[in-house]
Amino acid sequence: MAMRGGSAIKDQDRSLVYSAEDLWSKALDRGGVVNFFGSTFTLPQQKILGDLSAMQRTVDFWLQSKALQSRFPNLGPLVVRGRKGERKAHYEPDGVIAIPLDQPWACKEAVLVHEFAHHCAWSTDAPAHGPAYRHAMVEVANFVFGAEAALLLRAAYDGAGLEVADAT
């Protein structure tokens, strides 16, 4: 349970979100042709961003995107830094993404998208992996990977019984 704004907000969906996003990330690892309920489309293969400078350039590009700025008009600067001795990536509300560079999975685009979505949706009044976060994640996935990947992510959330907030 995280403290936000002086009160405890339970992040009850976190493990379900991680499971849904792990399935989605594995599909992006493979990329290629996907048959999805009778429709066939091609998924991109996610990149492995090998170092902090590549991750920072990627995040800077996303921050400068008019498409993401129009969806998330209050985006501030964001710094990507390394994280040692930890096995998880995380977002810090003061505009920092911390990546454990010694963990190969942490350098995948989907991990950076996840942490960037926290930056887009951060609120002291909502759970970190709640519906507003999931909405941001789908929007960022659509921008980075395309509509097909965003559709698969939304379906993974739906399969896990997770609501995605509507745009406000």
Predicted regions located by residue number:
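Active-site-proximal or metal-binding-adjacent scaffold patches in catalytic folds
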Residues: 1-110, 119-168
